Each structure stands twice: as C-alpha cells, then as structure tokens.
Regions:
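Active-site region of the double-stranded beta-helix
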Residues: 19, 28-131
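Non-catalytic accessory regions outside enzyme or core folds
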Residues: 1-6, 12-26, 30-32
Length: 133
C-alpha cells in the first residue's frame, strides 16, 4: 500500500505524523506544492524472471516518453534488484544510505517497493512507493 506520512521536526514536534494517507489524490495534492510530482501508472503484468532493463524500459516506453517530454530528464535507466542479483548487497547499501541528487529524478516501481524520506524545511515526508507508483 502506498503511504505518505508527514512529520514536523524540532522540540515541539509530535512522534505521530501530522498527515498519514494512502489516497493517491491526497498524496499528489500534498506533494505538488513542494515541487514533487506523484502519479500512478498501470503495471503491465508480471515481469519475466529474466527480464533485463531493456525489456522493462520497452514495456513503459510511451509513459517514459511522456514524462521526458514534460521535463528535463535526458537519461533513463532501470534496475531490478532481486534476491539473486550478483550485486544485491552493494546496491542495497547504496539505496539505504541517505543521499541527495543535484538533478531532478523520476522513479517508477514496476514491482517491489521503496521508501523515500524527504527532509524539506522543518518537515520530514516519508513516502512508501509500491508497484504502480
């Protein structure tokens, strides 16, 4: 289940979220004023166990082209991190380490999930994305 939780920071902040929602429209409306887009795409069936990045990108070529046309996203890549991936541990550590990007990025989950923790001003947003996000 996709989930957005918004927390305040500082000494007076509560341990409970100020907002908790799994409604895609509410998530998009909360993120939009922060310059963060959120949408859902139709997941196109299950991936073959041996699907490579090129096959994944080909399945979503029209959606990718639409997003690229609407912003500055010159590069596209895909990663599939399965339990038997040869670099699974190193890649997992890379994704677990808090880091920033100097450019805008678009993420889409065909399968699996990922948690993004965004520190914006005096707010922390936790966005759990799953297949289709």
């Amino acid at each position: 289940m996709t989930l957005l939780q918004v927390f305040g920071t500082g000494p007076a902040a509560s341990a409970s979220p100020n907002l908790s929602s799994s409604d895609p429209a509410a998530i998009a409306a909360t993120l939009a004023p922060l310059g963060i887009g959120f949408e859902r795409w139709q997941v196109q069936g299950c991936l073959a166990p041996d699907a490579d990045p090129a096959a994944i990108l080909a399945n979503y070529a029209s959606e990718i082209a639409r997003v690229q046309a609407g912003g500055s996203y010159p590069t596209v890549d895909a990663i599939r991190l399965t339990p038997n991936h040869p670099d699974r541990q190193a890649l997992r550590q890379k994704f677990l380490a808090e880091h920033t990007h100097s450019e805008d990025e678009v993420r889409f989950f065909v399968e699996g999930r990922g948690l993004f923790c965004l520190h914006i001003g005096d707010t922390v947003l936790q966005l759990l994305c799953e297949a289709g996000d």
